Amino acid sequence: AASDVYKRQVFYQSYGVPDDLDGRFEMITLHEHLVLRRLRREGTRHADLAQAVFDVMFTDMDRSLRLMGVSDISIGKRVKTMAKAFYGRVAAYDGGLDAEDNGAALHQALDRNLFGTTGGGGAATPLIAAYLRACDRLLADHSGDELAAGRLVWAPAPTAA
């Protein structure tokens, strides 16, 4: 599922995605966004599932922050900030995937969000963009019932930068 695919080490070791809390958040966001994007195409049929996916993601974020020792007083504010960031990224990635601009908008969104703390993804950016497009196409072929059952097939992770 989306909760595991972000752990593929190739993203961190070969592509330079920061292997820290921010980088992990960005990779989770990329993959959860694709699942939610696909569920939106189902209309209201799987609206409850889409909400559950979102809720589980942020419940897990809350739990992870607590395990890292973030105080109870700070958790709400941190999760709210993460949710706001998530929505901004969803809009940017949707726009990038839908744009007919030879990938420019998606590349900019990836450089800004995924590689924002490292000064850009360089050669990795177009490869990760191609991976996202491949995942988006694969998920488009899934039925709503397959998604509801958690049967997701992801594109192979990029293997070389």
Tell me the role of every PLM-derived stretch:
Residues 24, 28, 50-53, 78, ...:
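Amphipathic alpha-helix face/heptad-repeat signature
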Residues 16-18, 41-51, 69-76:
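Short, surface-exposed loop/turn segments at secondary-structure junctions
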Residues 36-43, 61-69:
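Membrane-helix exit/interface motif
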Residues 72-158:
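A charged, amphipathic interaction segment
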Residues 45-65:
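Short secondary-structure subsegments characteristic of cysteine-rich extracellular domains
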Residues 1-6:
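Short, small-residue-biased leader/transition segments that mark boundaries at the very start
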Residues 20-42:
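Hydrophobic/aromatic-rich, well-ordered segments within soluble, folded domains that form packed cores
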Residues 7-24:
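Active-site flanking loop/helix segments enriched in acidic
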